[in-house]
C-alpha cells in the first residue's frame, strides 16, 4: 500500500507542477488516468479476501432513504444529529459496533429517513488509512450526503471533504457525463463529438484509453467533456449523490454575513445548538431526496393518508409500487385505478407501466 501511496503522491506533485494549457492537456489527461487507477487499487485492494468492502461495518438499510453526515470533529455534527433525531424521531437511538452512533430514523412527510454519522471519512480515508474504506462503502449507498461545516471556517474544510469523497468515486451534485462508451474487438478508437470540445481531442482520448489497455472502442462525446469525465465513464464505478452543505453555528455571525451565506448554492445555515432553521433544512432534504409518496385505497374504503408507500423518484411505475408491497402482487395484477396528478381524470384505469406522481392515490384490482 505504501508504494501505491508514494506513486499517488508523485503523480499529484507532477500535476501540481504542470501548467494547465492546450499543450499540456494530453499529458495531464494521462496523469489523471494513472491517478484514478491507483486510487481504485487503494479502495479495492488486490487479493479479493479481507471481508469485502464493508468488513465489520455493515449498516442495515432501513427506511425509505439514507442520509450520510460528514464533517470534521467539533463542527456540531453530533448535536445536529441528536437534535434532529430527538425532535423528529419515532425510534430510539441505536448503536453499531464500529460506528459511533446512529441517532435513528426520522419521520418526515410520511417517509422514514435513516440518518448515519460517517466518522473517519476525512482523515486520509481515501489513502486507505483507518477504517475509512469501510465507511466509504456505506457512504456510497447514501441517497443524500450532508456536509456539516463550521460557519466560521467553512471554505478550507469544504474543499478537503469534497476531495476525500471525490477520491472514492463519489460525485456530489453532478450528473453522469454525457459520453457514450462501448468497447469492441477491432477497428481502433472511433471518436465522435456532437459538439465542440475544449479539452479532449482524438490523441488525448486514445492515450487515456491506452492507459486502461483499451485500443478498440467507440466513444461519443455529447457535451463539452473533460479528461476527468472520460475517466469516470471508463472506470464505471462512480456514484452520483446529491449533497447539502449545512453551515452550523450561525448564532455567532452577523445578519449581513447570513445574507451572503443564503446566496451560496446547496447551502443551509443552521444553529444545531439552538435548533434554528431546522424546518428549512428538512424542507431542503426533502427536495433533494425527491421521494414520491403513494397512498393506497382499499376497494370501497377511503384512502389511507397516514402511511404512504414511498418510492425513489427513479422507480415510480405501478409495477415498482407493487414490487415494494410484495413481489407476488404483480403476478395477480389486472389493472389499477389512480387518482392524482399523473392522470387526466379521476379515477383513471392504468396498466403496470404507468408512472405515478407524488401523493397519487392508487387502488390495485387483481385478476
Curated annotation (Swiss-Prot):
Annotated function: Catalyzes the conversion of GTP to GDP through hydrolysis of the gamma-phosphate bond in GTP. Appears to have an intrinsic GTPase activity that is stimulated by ZC3H15/DFRP1 binding likely by increasing the affinity for the potassium ions. Binds to microtubules and promotes microtubule polymerization and stability that are required for mitotic spindle assembly during prophase to anaphase transition. GTPase activity is not necessary for these microtubule-related functions.
Residue ranges, annotated region (Required for interaction with STK16): 2-16
Known disease link: Tan-Almurshedi syndrome: An autosomal recessive neurodevelopmental disorder characterized by global developmental delay, intellectual deficit, poor or absent speech, failure to thrive, short stature, microcephaly, and craniofacial anomalies.
EC number assigned by the record: 3.6.5.-
Keywords on record: Acetylation, Cytoplasm, Disease variant, Dwarfism, GTP-binding, Host-virus interaction, Hydrolase, Hydroxylation, Intellectual disability, Magnesium, Metal-binding, Nucleotide-binding, Nucleus, Phosphoprotein, Ubl conjugation
Residues that hold GTP according to the record: 71-78, 117-121, 248-251
GO annotation, biological process: cytoplasmic translation; positive regulation of microtubule polymerization; regulation of mitotic spindle assembly
CC terms in the record's Gene Ontology section: cytoplasm; cytosol; membrane; nuclear body; nucleoplasm; nucleus
NCBIfam families in alphabetical order: small_GTP
InterPro entries, sorted: Beta-grasp_dom_sf (IPR012675), DRG (IPR045001), G_OBG (IPR031167), GTP-bd (IPR006073), GTP-binding_2 (IPR031662), GTP1-OBG_CS (IPR006074), P-loop_NTPase (IPR027417), Small_GTP-bd (IPR005225)
Temperature and activity: Optimum temperature is 42 degrees Celsius.
Name of protein: Developmentally-regulated GTP-binding protein 1
Cofactor dependency: Mg(2+); K(+)
Amino acid at each position: 500500500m505504501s508504494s501505491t501511496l508514494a506513486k499517488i503522491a508523485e503523480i499529484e506533485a507532477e500535476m501540481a507542477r504542470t501548467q494547465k494549457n492546450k499543450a499540456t492537456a494530453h499529458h495531464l489527461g494521462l496523469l489523471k488516468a494513472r491517478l484514478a487507477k491507483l486510487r481504485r487499487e487503494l479502495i479495492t485492494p488486490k487479493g479479493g479476501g479481507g471481508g469485502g468492502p464493508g468488513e465489520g461495518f455493515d449498516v442495515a438499510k432501513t427506511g425509505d432513504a439514507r442520509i450520510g453526515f460528514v464533517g470534521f470533529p467539533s463542527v456540531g455534527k453530533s448535536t445536529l444529529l441528536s437534535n434532529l433525531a430527538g425532535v423528529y424521531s419515532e425510534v430510539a437511538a441505536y448503536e453499531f459496533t464500529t460506528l459511533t452512533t446512529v441517532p435513528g430514523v426520522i419521520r418526515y412527510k410520511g417517509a422514514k429517513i435513516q440518518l448515519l454519522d460517517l466518522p473517519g471519512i476525512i482523515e486520509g480515508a481515501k489513502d486507505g488509512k483507518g477504517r475509512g474504506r469501510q465507511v466509504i462503502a456505506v457512504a456510497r449507498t447514501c441517497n443524500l450526503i450532508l456536509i456539516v461545516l463550521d460557519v466560521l471556517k467553512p471554505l478550507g474544510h469544504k474543499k478537503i471533504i469534497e476531495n476525500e469523497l471525490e477520491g472514492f468515486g463519489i460525485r456530489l451534485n453532478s450528473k453522469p457525463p454525457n459520453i457514450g462508451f462501448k468497447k469492441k474487438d477491432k477497428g481502433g478508437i472511433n471518436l465522435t463529438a456532437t459538439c465542440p470540445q475544449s479539452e479532449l481531442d482524438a490523441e488525448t482520448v486514445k492515450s487515456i484509453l491506452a492507459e486502461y489497455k483499451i485500443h478498440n472502442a467507440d466513444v461519443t462525446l455529447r457535451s463539452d467533456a473533460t479528461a476527468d469525465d472520460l475517466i469516470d465513464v471508463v472506470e464505471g464505478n462512480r456514484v452520483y449523490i446529491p449533497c447539502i452543505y449545512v453551515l452550523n453555528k450561525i448564532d455567532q455571525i452577523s445578519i449581513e454575513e447570513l445574507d451572503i451565506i443564503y446566496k451560496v448554492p446547496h447551502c443551509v445555515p443552521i444553529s444545531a445548538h439552538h435548533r434554528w432553521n431546522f424546518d428549512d433544512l428538512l424542507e431542503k432534504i426533502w427536495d433533494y431526496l425527491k421521494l414520491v409518496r403513494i397512498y393506497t385505497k382499499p376497494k370501497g374504503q377511503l384512502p389511507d393518508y397516514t402511511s404512504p408507500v414511498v418510492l425513489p423518484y427513479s422507480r415510480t411505475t405501478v409495477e415498482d409500487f407493487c414490487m415494494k408491497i410484495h413481489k407476488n402482487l404483480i403476478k395477480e395484477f389486472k389493472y389499477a385505478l389512480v387518482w392524482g396528478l399523473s392522470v387526466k381524470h379521476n379515477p383513471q384505469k392504468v396498466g403496470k407501466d404507468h408512472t405515478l406522481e407524488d401523493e397519487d392515490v392508487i387502488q390495485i384490482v387483481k385478476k
